[in-house]
Amino acid sequence: MDKKKKRIVIALGGNALGNTLPEQMKAVKITAKAIVDLIEEGCEVIVAHGNGPQVGMINNAMAALSREDANQPNTPLSVCVAMSQAYIGYDLQNALREELYNRNIYDIPVATMITQVRVDADDPAFDAPSKPIGHFMTEEQAKIAEEKYGYIMKEDAGRGYRRVVASPKPAEIVEIGAIRSLVDSGQLVIACGGGGIPVTR
């Protein structure tokens, strides 16, 4: 690591990335400008991001496919988190690379790391889901989702109801060594999307 550079982690909220693909494409371009501003000021940046709306949409789509096709097994939420890391990372890294090139910065590679985090299988968070995912619903829609799909729904800041899932405390980043290697080599890394994919030993 260049000692002259200040290493910082930027955490982007999933809601700030928009609720649709076009919204996300627009949001990441704005975000990329702010991040590259920091790089030009001499900062070494690592990007993390939320995924609440995105992972919910992916999960809903995969669940709908499973309901329509008896031969299509249900997709675990962990796989949906991995999908969200990949597609958010894809948009972010392309926007960042474009912004870097627009400023004639060609020596900073951008990479997305699919990231897992080790959690305790006995974490009480598994029994008290609290992380909102997916889109907002009315109270009536939320009741249908609970009855029909077994989702746990909660009101979210007076804006409507959303599905909530467990959010266990991360104990260790599984890919931390790989992330360090990339950052130390001068790459702009996007990692730990959605807090990481929770795994147990």
Regions found by a protein language model. Give the residues of each.
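Short acidic, glycine/serine/threonine-rich loops at helix termini
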Residues: T20-P22, G56-A61, D122-A128, T200-R201
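Ligand-binding beta-strand-loop-alpha-helix segment within the catalytic cores
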Residues: L65-V189
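Short, ordered loop/turn segments at secondary-structure junctions
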Residues: G13-N15, N51-P53, N60, T115-V117, ...
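Conserved mixed alpha/beta catalytic, RNA-binding, or beta-rich assembly cores of soluble enzyme
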Residues: A16, I173, L188-R201
